[in-house]
Each structure stands twice: as structure tokens, then as C-alpha cells.
Amino acid sequence: SSSAASDVYKRQVLMDWLQNKIWPAEAGLNDEDIYWGTMLSIAEMLKTGTTCFADMYFAMDKVAQAVNETGIRASLSRGLVGLTPDADEKLQDNEMLFKNWHGKADGRIRVMFGPHAPYTCPVPYLKKVVAKAGELNAEIHMHLCETAGEVSDCVKEHNMTPIKLMNSLDMFDCGTLAAHCVHVSEADLDIMADKKVRVAHNPQSNLKLASGIAPVPA
């Protein structure tokens, strides 16, 4: 659903890219922009043989509509940021997305809860997300260990890596799709293996933003 921004901002570190480019650009998008951006992305995916994708964004009803109309499969999450005044409202949006779309389109649409990342979701908010996901027997999609800075900041604040922090919150017991996982330790990998955490490797984004390369062979 963010195809329109995919070729615009090259070679920028993640936080500069998000704060100064992507988030301001996204503030100007409306539901129709997201619908047609999703349709474009789906066309590009199908053209190259991709038949399933995972997306975390906003106006996800429009994304689900595009998935329903095109025949592709998708795992959809409402992107959740716990730092804004409407954070609880967005969690309710994700709940409604789950109730309205999970298992729909002949089972092609799966809905997860989408806390964006450790640096945008404080622990009290993450606890709410995990509780709601557990209540609905839903899984969770989250960006984890994308950059070295994310990991070091998390260790400074919590004395734990992002993987260890999420494990301490019982997030992985819900079933988790973790995006990126570039900077993970051997101890992190042991936790991920034990909890059956699935990784969505994103080499194009990680290389464009010089975040690093996930240890996929591990």
C-alpha cells in the first residue's frame, strides 16, 4: 500500500527516512490513495509471481477490499503506534479489522494485530495489544531488530533486546510474524526458534536504508 513512496527516497537511514519523508508524506494520503496504491502493488506482485503478502498500514479496510477483488492472499494488520492520543482508537480499528475481515475472501485474508515497533509502542501499550490479540486468538505482526540503533536503544531502556522484551511480554505466545530481524543475537535466535517466531526478511528495504542483512542462513 506504500508503492507511491517506494522509489522516492533513496539511501537514507531508517529514522530520518520515516520522520522526515515517509510519515509527512503519509499524512496527506486518503483512503482512495491507499486503495489504488494497494491495487498497483498487487499488480506488481502478481506480475512477478508473488501470490501472498503481509501489510501493516492504515485504512486497512481499503487494502482488504483490494485483496478481495484481486484474488491474491494477504496477512493484514492495522499499524499501531502507542505514542499518539488516538492509540487506543487505533487498537479498536485493528479489532474491527479482525472481526470484519479475518478468514474472509474464501480464507485468503488473514488479520493480525500490528504494533509498529518497540520505539513507537511503549510497554503499557504493547501489553494492551497482546491482551487483545490473546482475547481474539489473533496473531501479531511487528517490526523487530531492524537497525542496530533500535536494539541498542531497547537495551538501554529495558536492559533487554527487542526479542527478549517481546518474549517477556508473552507476545510470542500469540504467534508472531517479525519483520526484518537484521540485528539478532544467538540468544535471540534461540528464543525465536523456541517460540516459533516467523521472520519476514526484507532485503530491499534493509539494503536501501543501510540497515544490514538478516542472518537468514542461521
Annotated model-derived regions:
Residues 1-5, 9:
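Single conserved hydrophobic/aromatic residue that forms the stacking wall/gate
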Residues 3, 140-147, 200, 210-211, ...:
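Short acidic/histidine-rich active-site segments
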Residues 62-182:
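Metal-coordinating catalytic core of metallo-dependent amide/deamination hydrolases
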